[in-house]
């Protein structure tokens, strides 16, 4: 019977009991299956299955036989299933006491065969019953390098520490920039790009005199501002000193060359720049003051706009009503005085005998008229014809968009036969109209995306 030993991250190694047993002779015929002639037990499952007559066979042979016949292969005794078989406790106990080698004594050759590893294998000899506990702790079992999936090195568990120190796939942290997860194989590439990696100055200022190494990311700054070998210009170049020299010679240059005339020229240049800046400042100051005044004007205008009233309430009393009915036949209108609501100009057109349309015949028509204005305006308005009995007042309201010179209202506000003294709408030969107007704010379009 074949024994399988699983090891960490490794394809299981298959052994036979004859590979592991210390004394093969001790495996008498009692331990062999009479059908397949293999050992009836293995180190992973120590069970000797027998029929009620005591005939022992290996589990595999029992399973194959019972698929076709429900009987013992030796005595033909009825056997319903593998689970109905009993165990030979004596054989099992004797097998568990057999001495075996640790499976980790062996190694697999490229051919797939196994051989004893005299140098690195586990030399432990133990009872079959002790194998399971030993395998869990054995430091000689084979594993794969855990550092990276790319490292396919196969080694024993007790060799892992030495391997990790030289594994080319070992992950580490850059000691300069702190980047984590670097693989040793790739570290040279990283160090060739690492901004914190110390390198020599390209101008070789790392001589014993200067002993200079710089982080790669600071090289440009170092050359432009620090490196003693960088050739620089005299700070009085604009004033006329055109000499160039290494930065390390700056002090010597300043000592050897008289820069007084250059200093005077520099001072003159600064004076000119200052005077020019002063003129620019005064010019900007004037512009600032102008803008400040403009801002105050705009604030005042804004205040006026905010104080504009965007609603209007009033009464319009039309006197001598009986005469007006005669003087203003259809479609002639009585017009109110002009009035302002906010910054918009309106008037009311009142038709005692109806307006232009045929539908307005015999009706009193009334309209709100907006004068020329380029901006469309949303207006909410109402007209209320008062009655002696206020519960009988006639009131209509509407909300409309007014464009340039247009009007909104009602062609059939009320039948003019109802506007009489008897009905209460004419009081002392006058009719009174309540006017309510409100300019509504502009509606903003919703954002869409």
Swiss-Prot record:
Nucleotide-binding among keywords: no
Keywords assigned by UniProt, alphabetized: Coiled coil, Cytoplasm, Metal-binding, Repeat, Zinc, Zinc-finger
Family matches, as Pfam families: MATH_2, zf-TRAF
A GO term from the CC aspect: cytoplasm
Zinc finger motifs (RING-type), residue ranges: 33-76
Stretches annotated zinc finger (TRAF-type): 133-187, 189-251
Secretion signal span: none
Domain of life: Eukaryota
Subcellular location as annotated: Cytoplasm
CDD domains xref list: MATH
InterPro entries, A to Z: MATH/TRAF_dom, TRAF-like, Znf_RING/FYVE/PHD, Znf_TRAF
Residue stretches in coiled coil: 263-309
UniProt GO molecular function: zinc ion binding
Every MATH domain range: 311-437
Domain remarks: The MATH/TRAF domain binds to receptor cytoplasmic domains.
Function field: Probable adapter protein and signal transducer that links members of the tumor necrosis factor receptor family to different signaling pathways by association with the receptor cytoplasmic domain and kinases.
Family according to the record: Belongs to the TNF receptor-associated factor family. A subfamily.
Protein name as annotated: TNF receptor-associated factor family protein DDB_G0272340
Organism: Dictyostelium discoideum
Organism taxonomic ancestry: Eukaryota, Amoebozoa, Evosea, Eumycetozoa, Dictyostelia
